[in-house]
C-alpha cells in the first residue's frame, strides 16, 4: 500500500462526504492503474451511496469548469493524482 497524502484544493461538500471521497479514491487507486477505471469506480460508488448522477475526472493535468449541485463538489489531490468529483443532473 502506498501512502498518498490527500490535499483538498476546493470543496463544497460536508466533511463526512469529503472523507468518503478520499477513502473511495484511495480504494480506487489501490485497485486500478488506468485513470478511466479509477474515475469509474469512484463515480459508481458515489452513485450507489449518495444517489445519481455523479461525475468524476481523474488525472495529472486537466482544466475544468463545471456546474454542480450545492454541497456536492470536491477537487483534491491524492499524491500526484488530481480528482474532481461532483454531482449534476
UniProtKB/Swiss-Prot annotation:
One GO location term (cellular component): microtubule associated complex
Residue spans crossing the bilayer: none
Disulphide linkage map: none
Compartmental location: Cytoplasm, Cytoskeleton; Nucleus envelope; Cytoplasmic granule
Known function: Acts as a non-catalytic accessory component of a dynein complex. Part of a complex with bicd-1 and egal-1, which is recruited to the nuclear envelope by unc-83, where in turn, it recruits dynein to the nuclear surface and regulates nuclear migrations in hypodermal precursor cells. Probably within a dynein motor complex, plays a role in the cell fate specification of the germline and oogenesis. In particular, it inhibits germ cell proliferation. Regulates the function and localization of the RNA-binding protein fbf-2 in the germline. Plays a role in mitotic and meiotic processes.
Database matches in PANTHER family: DYNEIN LIGHT CHAIN (PTHR11886:SF35)
PROSITE patterns cross-referenced by the UniProt entry: DYNEIN_LIGHT_1
Major location category of this protein: cytoplasm
Source species of the chain: Caenorhabditis elegans
Tissue and organ distribution: Broadly expressed in tissues including the intestine, body wall muscles, germs cells, oocytes, the rectal valve and cells in the head.
Keyword Coiled coil annotated: no
Disruption phenotype: RNAi-mediated knockdown results in viable animals, with progeny that have nuclear migration defects in the hyp7 hypodermal precursor cells at the L1 stage of larval development. RNAi-mediated knockdown results in increased germ cell apoptosis, but does not affect somatic cell death. RNAi-mediated knockdown results in reduced mett-10 accumulation in nuclei. RNAi-mediated knockdown prevents fbf-2 localization to P-granules.
Pfam families in UniProt: Dynein_light
GO molecular function terms listed in the Swiss-Prot or TrEMBL record: dynein intermediate chain binding
GO biological process, one term: apoptotic process
Name the record gives this protein: Dynein light chain 1, cytoplasmic
Subunit structure: Interacts with mett-10; the interaction is direct, and is required for the nuclear localization of mett-10. Component of a dynein-regulating complex composed of at least bicd-1, dlc-1 and egal-1. Interacts with egal-1 and unc-83. Interacts with fbf-2.
Site positions for Required for mett-10 binding: 62, 67, 73
